[in-house]
Amino acid sequence: GVQTCALPILKAGRNQDAWRLNTPCENIVIRHCDILKGHTLLGIGSEMSGGVRNVYMHNCTAPDSVFRLFFAKTNHRRGGFIENIWMKNVKAGKMQRVLEVDTDVLYQWRDLVPTYQDSITFINGLYMDSVTCDRTEAVYDLKGDARLPIKNVEIRNVTVGEVTKFVKNVVNAENVVEENIIYKEKQDKQ
């Protein structure tokens, strides 16, 4: 388990090396972690070709400012899997996204290095429950790959003080369940 740390980021190797080793990052409990400022409270990837599964994060905070509370990122070169990831009882300040999954993260490598082999990441079972934050641009943003959509996402009991751009965006995702998402939309000043 991981506890009382400041930056929980889970990785599981990149491309051929990770596929050859076949050693997933798995069975991890993350609790009582506080991140003051940074990119993400719980980050998975993009180096996750060996797979990440069975992660339970609970009772953590991001009181100031982060880009995302929970961010899973991969691309069509990575392969591997992301499955059975839980985030529960989290309190946060302001951010861009409460939950984001992006399956097309290549940054500068998109044009610098050619794709020799497509290997789509299997993403199944992402669960978020009892999350409170002050302000976000969006509650959740799920961008799956059409060839292997994201499956089984549950977002429950999320309270946001203010949403400034949009509540949700879902592309290539199946069985997305939301329950009891409470938010206030940004009011334009007259």
For each feature predicted by the language model, list its residue ranges.
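Leucine-rich repeat
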Residues: 9-14, 19, 36, 40-45, 121, 138-147, 165, 170, ...
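Surface-exposed loop/turn motifs in large extracellular/passenger domains
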Residues: 15-33, 48-62, 75-91, 108-132, ...
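Structural detector of coil-to-beta-strand junctions
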Residues: 9, 41-43, 69-71, 98-100, ...
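Catalytic cores of secreted or luminal carbohydrate-active enzymes
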Residues: 90, 94-99
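Short, small-residue-biased leader/transition segments that mark boundaries at the very start
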Residues: 1-7
